[in-house]
Design a protein with these regions (language model features):
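Histidine- and aromatic-rich ligand-binding microenvironments
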Residues: 31-35, 56-66, 258-272
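Short N-terminal secondary-structure initiator segments
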Residues: 1-21, 59-80, 134-160, 213
Length: 272
């Protein structure tokens, strides 16, 4: 059985453009009538084409497909399959973490207004942190920028989080409200995703944090008012010591007058 390009496209449910592209890539090799220039395809071509489609559905590249239907050694095919299996398993982890993120985000949106301004103690797991800016001025270190790119590929498991040093709460309203900006991820998730704990990565201790949702309804930089409620609670409770403070956006809403309100989860490490 021989097919014209139109017949093969109809049979396989693809366009003639796709078949021409696969031929150009060396994935299929139709017979060419030297007199007419017409291309004719056989069952050999349909089977090779469909094998490539299956491999593409598993997210192998066309270049990898070409190698796999060429003459790879067992070592070469093993390497390509193992690499893709590892990539898909990592994707599974990312998908699982993304689902968990969305479930948590759904609950945050449900309770947003009732938690705004409320203060509670919440236990957080150990985290990894990659810091790459002092306030909003980014560090230009090339190694750090490469790590930043790798971490950004892991969103939403990685989150953008501001960090304030412990002296901000210990010397409240003295000097500037300083912070650095970076990405954070649960330590267990980082290990599952294969992120490396390099010299740029810090470990943020888990445990109890005094927590609130703060509403920022102005466009300027963060002021001391963002910490007023937490600091008042710290003073009232008389904790033995406090650690660093972390803040990340959890929601944003546009108001009837067009102004924007951002909701920030802000937490301070406490030692009781």
């Amino acid at each position: 059985m021989r097919y014209t390009i139109s017949e093969m496209a109809s049979l396989l449910g693809v366009t003639t453009h796709t078949l021409r592209y696969y031929e150009k890539m060396g994935l299929i090799h139709p017979e060419v009538n030297e007199d007419t220039g017409y291309r004719y395809y056989t069952v050999t071509d349909t089977r090779r084409f469909n094998l490539c489609r299956e491999l593409r559905a598993a997210e192998l590249s066309l270049e990898e497909c070409r190698e796999l239907i060429g003459a790879p050694t067992v070592e070469q095919s093993d390497a390509m399959f193992n690499h893709q299996i590892a990539q898909l398993r990592r994707r599974q982890v990312l998908d699982e973490l993304a689902i968990r993120f969305l479930e948590h985000k759904r609950e945050q949106y449900r309770t947003l207004e009732q938690n705004a301004g409320r203060i509670w103690v919440q236990n957080f797991p150990e985290m990894w942190r990659l810091t790459f800016s002092q306030e909003e001025a980014a560090d230009r270190d090339k190694e750090l920028q490469q790590e930043k790119a790798e971490w950004l590929e892991c969103m939403p498991a990685t989150r953008w989080v501001s960090r304030l040093p412990r002296r901000v709460m210990e010397q409240f309203r003295v000097g500037r409200n300083e912070y650095d900006y970076g990405l954070m991820i649960e330590a267990d998730a980082a290990r599952r995703l294969g992120l490396k704990r390099t010299k740029h990565v810090e470990v943020v201790c888990g445990g109890d944090y005094l927590t609130t949702i703060w509403k920022k309804d102005y466009r300027g930089s963060f002021g001391w008012d963002s910490l007023d409620d937490l600091h008042a609670e710290i003073v009232q409770c008389g904790f033995r010591a406090v650690g660093e403070t972390f803040s990340s956006i959890v929601a944003s809403r546009e108001q009837p007058d067009g102004s924007i309100v951002n909701y920030h989860l802000t937490r301070t490490k406490i030692y009781t």
